[in-house]
């Protein structure tokens, strides 16, 4: 999907140079110089015809889920008491991409984050995961239509971007792997270019029209992720008014009410709801026994996460009342360096790191990995998650006559954790806490 966006932008620029004078030039877009391998047997790209994941996919899913939960903990530690939303899967994809350029202990450090899988495993598994996420909702659309826009309507889009100083060459083999497995935008520029911020904003305009990335003139290389999700709910909801007791005072809000699959462990309970077009499940979880959501996330690991998902039984439902809510991530790219160092990437961002397979001189340095923080609006109208939403989607109130059969009720009227996870691998595409 990202290649479609990039090619469309490039075509528009070629047809009318005045349309976007701040776009990166053809010479700056190193990724555009490489032709993607479309052999699905080698790349496991779902859009190119891959129907089964690689044999190492289960191990990959477990490793990325574990990493995602760690990253959520670190993100929540930075802003205790505040709502948080991130796309840990996209960060994992970016680190996987970078592993192709890393060498020595730097490469080992990245691979250890994902259970010691090889870089080749990360490439093929990441390619299958990302391409499936981005393609499923697009299969019913005419991609050849003049008005086709991959970010219009139901979609998932995960963007990875590497921006490198013009002082460094990037190896052809690294660019080829980036194209084959990730479709990342690899840009080479002068970091003291006074138009750099405008150019980056142009690149990210499909995700956030006001995106801001702070890069020092002496920078060598930085990575950036951005993401977008839009969909409707598979099930219908009725609307009830109530109060949400967050970290501050209680606030009146609208609650979406529906029968949903019930989850429960000794530590927490929750629900599973499904999106209509994307291959995603929405998981909402509230701790038991008076435990705060912060303390619950601090201890949340694969065992508890799997326990929740495995507790789902056919026909076991609950009358779920979920608040309509929004989280505003803003437009400034957030540094993940400290959070990733806390996850165990101790040397990746230092002068001791080695990137010989990205730059043969091995002089390049990764200054930071940024995320353009997604915002989210969740209501009975659906889900809108992007770098910055335009505002709250108001409840439409069209489903007042929904029949509810569940006797047990679970109200999410206090801080809770939530996830949008892949319905095949259970990898968290988005992870957050609303409080």
Language-model regions, residue ranges each:
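Extended hydrophobic
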Residues: 269-285, 401-435
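Non-catalytic interaction/Regulatory regions outside core domains
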Residues: 18, 26-48, 362-364, 375, ...
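Detector for small/aliphatic-rich hydrophobic stretches
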Residues: 5, 18-189
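Internal alpha/beta scaffold segment
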Residues: 287-314
């Amino acid at each position: 999907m990202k290649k479609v966006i990039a090619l469309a932008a490039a075509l528009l620029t070629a047809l009318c140079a005045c349309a976007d004078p701040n776009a990166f030039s053809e010479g700056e877009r190193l990724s555009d110089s490489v032709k993607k391998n479309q052999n699905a047997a080698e790349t496991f790209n779902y859009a190119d015809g891959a129907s089964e994941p690689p044999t190492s996919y289960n191990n990959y899913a477990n490793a990325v889920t574990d990493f995602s939960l760690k990253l959520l903990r670190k993100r929540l530690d930075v802003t205790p008491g505040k709502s948080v939303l991130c796309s840990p899967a996209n960060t994992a994809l970016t680190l996987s991409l970078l592993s192709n350029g890393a060498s020595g202990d730097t490469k080992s450090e990245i691979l250890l984050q994902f259970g010691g899988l090889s870089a080749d495993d990360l490439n093929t598994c990441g390619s299958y995961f990302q391409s499936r996420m981005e393609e499923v909702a697009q299969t019913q659309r005419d991609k050849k239509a003049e008005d086709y826009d991959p970010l219009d309507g139901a979609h998932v889009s995960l963007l990875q971007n590497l921006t490198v100083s013009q002082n460094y060459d990037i190896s052809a083999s690294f660019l080829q792997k980036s194209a084959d497995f990730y479709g990342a935008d690899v840009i080479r520029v002068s970091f003291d270019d006074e138009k750099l911020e405008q150019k980056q904003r142009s690149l990210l305009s499909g995700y956030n029209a006001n995106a801001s990335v702070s890069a020092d003139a002496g920078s060598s290389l930085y990575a950036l992720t951005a993401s977008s999700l839009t969909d409707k709910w598979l099930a219908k909801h009725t609307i009830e008014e109530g109060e949400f007791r967050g970290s501050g005072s209680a606030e009146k809000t609208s609650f979406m009410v529906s029968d949903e699959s019930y989850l429960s462990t000794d530590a927490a309970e929750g629900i599973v709801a499904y999106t209509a077009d994307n291959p995603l499940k929405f998981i909402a979880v509230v701790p038991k026994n008076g435990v705060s959501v912060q303390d619950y996330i601090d201890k949340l690991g694969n065992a508890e996460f799997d326990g929740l998902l495995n507790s789902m039984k056919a026909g076991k439902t609950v009358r779920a009342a979920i608040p309509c809510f929004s989280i505003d991530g803003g437009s400034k790219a957030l540094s993940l360096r400290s959070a990733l160092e806390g996850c165990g990437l101790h040397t990746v961002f230092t002068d001791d790191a080695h990137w010989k397979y990205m730059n043969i001189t091995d002089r390049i340095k990764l200054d930071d990995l940024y995320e353009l923080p997604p915002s989210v609006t969740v209501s009975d109208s659906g889900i809108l998650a992007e770098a910055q939403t335009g505002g709250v989607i108001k409840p439409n109130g069209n489903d007042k006559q929904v029949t509810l059969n569940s006797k047990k009720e679970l109200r999410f009227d206090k801080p809770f954790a939530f996830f949008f996870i892949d319905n095949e691998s259970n990898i968290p595409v988005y992870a957050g806490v609303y409080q």
